[in-house]
Amino acid sequence: MKVWNARNDHLTINQWATRIDEILEAPDGGEVIYNVDENDPREYDAIFIGGGAAGRFGSAYLRAMGGRQLIVDRWPFLGGSCPHNACVPHHLFSDCAAELMLARTFSGQYWFPDMTEKVVGIKEVVDLFRAGRNGPHGIMNFQSKEQLNLEYILNCPAKVIDNHTVEAAGKVFKAKNLILAVGAGPGTLDVPGVNAKGVFDHATLVEELDYEPGSTVVVVGGSKTAVEYGCFFNATGRRTVMLVRTEPLKLIKDNETRAYVLDRMKEQGMEIISGSNVTRIEEDANGRVQAVVAMTPNGEMRIETDFVFLGLGEQPRSAELAKILGLDLGPKGEVLVNEYLQTSVPNVYAVGDLIGGPMEMFKARKSGCYAARNVMGEKISYTPKNYPDFLHTHYEVSFLGMGEEEARAAGHEIVTIKMPPDTENGLNVALPASDRTMLYAFGKGTAHMSGFQKIVIDAKTRKVLGAHHVGYGAKDAFQYLNVLIKQGLTVDELGDMDELFLNPTHFIQLSRLRAGSKNLVSL
């Protein structure tokens, strides 16, 4: 084992990126990055097993509180799989999907090229991501060492001995606590042929795609991952078939919003087959996928393809640690924790995707910080709930709180404010209109593509219960709007805000149109 003692070396961000790339490309697995303060005599308050979002943010918080921490991670960089082959790549792919939908909609018009029969390379975009991903890795290694003064051992899987002891880089480290932050991996499918060449998940797509897929893509799954990648594949000009076991995008609770999203996907040519179960993946003589067979409500369906994408969620990486430490697990393999993020084993905490859903960045980062605070003596609970949510299709879809049907079922007398309004022209009006949707709003026959937005309000209390937006640019606002809604935001207070016109969300000005009414009615 070759170990680079990096403690007294001070690399720039670019130097870090180059070093990481060299380690990743090394045929022997590369050197261990050893950044440990041997002059600090204190016992570690916590060793973080994993340096992804939960481990890195938790470490930074613990260090800021005056504690001593150590991260041990199998990757040669901090930040985990998210910026390497998980959540960040699809943002690039979704940018491409939005641009391509615009270009295809206005094909041959204005300055747009003729996109008829144009097929865009999937591998070309994947290669673009691969070539640029080490820059962010370099930033995180640099920032964590030079600015946050974190201790870490990277490119070195941790060997957990017990609830206070970890072996790494040929040395044994002791800590008062362990914080497990090893994340989750892609879900899989238990059918014949699933290991054929040409069957990918989000990680192997980035790491292993070495050919340009043919004219048909099959996506298995119907939630975030499946939809986000599926829309990208569709936008490249390929037939895209989604095989969904139940119904797609059930996480969008408002039926009208969900219907708008699915209608736009289908309008782009996506084939969504609900109630389907894949029974086998057929291989050719060379072990490469040649077809997918599924049982659908209309009987058996066989789809010829050389490219299958599994968008089946995430599975916590809990098995090995559970066996070593005796951790209690939940039905989906998640490590069970209490409100203080403590596991069933004394002095062992678990955070991030390892503890199950929601498998979101905010939960990873916050749970890491809350675990650190508990380790440092605070008695503080964390249970993620009532959070805003988001996904990509060809659009950006943001939502929070209650949908209309959910609010009615809960006993609320509700009114809604939405754009476009319910009219005889339906969606075929030039509103909503804002950044990135103006061409759709004013284009001939494309007004219905300019987006959809809606807020749900309790007519008696005047409080905003939920908000839903399909378009572009609203995600950032939803982060803050969610806090205000949890604090009891009313339609009157919303209407009294200052909009930055033309704002992606029209909620402020539309609320102002109704706020003067003693008895609220829908708009």
UniProtKB/Swiss-Prot annotation:
Lineage of the species this protein comes from: Bacteria, Pseudomonadati, Pseudomonadota, Alphaproteobacteria, Hyphomicrobiales
Q: Looking at the Swiss-Prot or TrEMBL record, what is one Pfam family this protein matches?
A: Pyr_redox_dim
Miscellaneous comment as given in the Swiss-Prot or TrEMBL entry: The active site is a redox-active disulfide bond. 2-KPC reduction and carboxylation assumes the formation of a mixed disulfide between the interchange thiol (Cys-82) and coenzyme M.
The intrachain disulfides are: 82-87
Q: What cofactor does this one take?
A: FAD
Give the residues the record marks as binding 2-oxopropyl-coenzyme M. 56, 82, 365
Which positions are annotated as binding FAD?
Answer: 53-54, 81, 158, 353, 361, 501
Q: What is known of its domains?
A: Contains three domains, the FAD binding domain, the NADPH binding domain, and the dimerization domain. The binding of the substrate induces a conformational change that results in the sequestration of the substrate at the dimer interface.
Organism, by scientific name, is: Xanthobacter autotrophicus (strain ATCC BAA-1158 / Py2)
The protein's enzyme class: oxidoreductase
Q: Which GO terms describe its molecular function?
A: 2-oxopropyl-CoM reductase (carboxylating) activity
Q: How the protein assembles, per its UniProt entry?
A: Homodimer. Component II of the aliphatic epoxide carboxylation complex together with components I, III and IV.
Pathway info: Alkene metabolism; propylene degradation
Q: Which family does it belong to?
A: Belongs to the class-I pyridine nucleotide-disulfide oxidoreductase family.
Q: Name one GO biological process term.
A: propylene catabolic process
Name of protein: 2-oxopropyl-CoM reductase, carboxylating
Where, in this chain's numbering, is NADP(+) bound? 222-225, 245-246, 360
Q: Its function?
A: Involved in aliphatic epoxide carboxylation. Catalyzes the reductive cleavage of the thioether bond of 2-oxopropyl-coenzyme M (2-KPC), and the subsequent carboxylation of the ketopropyl cleavage product, yielding the products acetoacetate and free coenzyme M.
Which transformation does this protein catalyse, written as a reaction?
A: coenzyme M + acetoacetate + NADP(+) = 2-oxopropyl-coenzyme M + CO2 + NADPH
Q: Which UniProt keywords apply?
A: Disulfide bond, FAD, Flavoprotein, NADP, Oxidoreductase, Plasmid, Redox-active center
tRNA processing keyword on record: no
Entry's EC annotation? 1.8.1.5
Q: Which gene encodes it?
A: xecC
Its activity is regulated as follows: Inhibited (at 40%) by the coenzyme M analog 2-bromoethanesulfonate (BES). BES is a time-dependent inactivator of dithiothreitol-reduced 2-KPCC, where the redox active cysteines are in the free thiol forms. BES does not inactivate air-oxidized 2-KPCC, where the redox active cysteine pair is in the disulfide form. BES specifically alkylates the interchange thiol that facilitates thioether bond cleavage and enolacetone formation during catalysis.
List the PANTHER family: GLUTATHIONE REDUCTASE (NADPH), MERCURIC REDUCTASE
How is the cofactor bound, as the UniProt entry phrases it? Answer: Binds 1 FAD per subunit.
Q: Which domain of life is it from?
A: Bacteria
The record's annotation in InterPro entries points to: FAD/NAD-bd_sf, FAD/NAD-binding_dom, FAD/NAD-linked_Rdtase_dimer_sf, Pyr_nucl-diS_OxRdtase_dimer
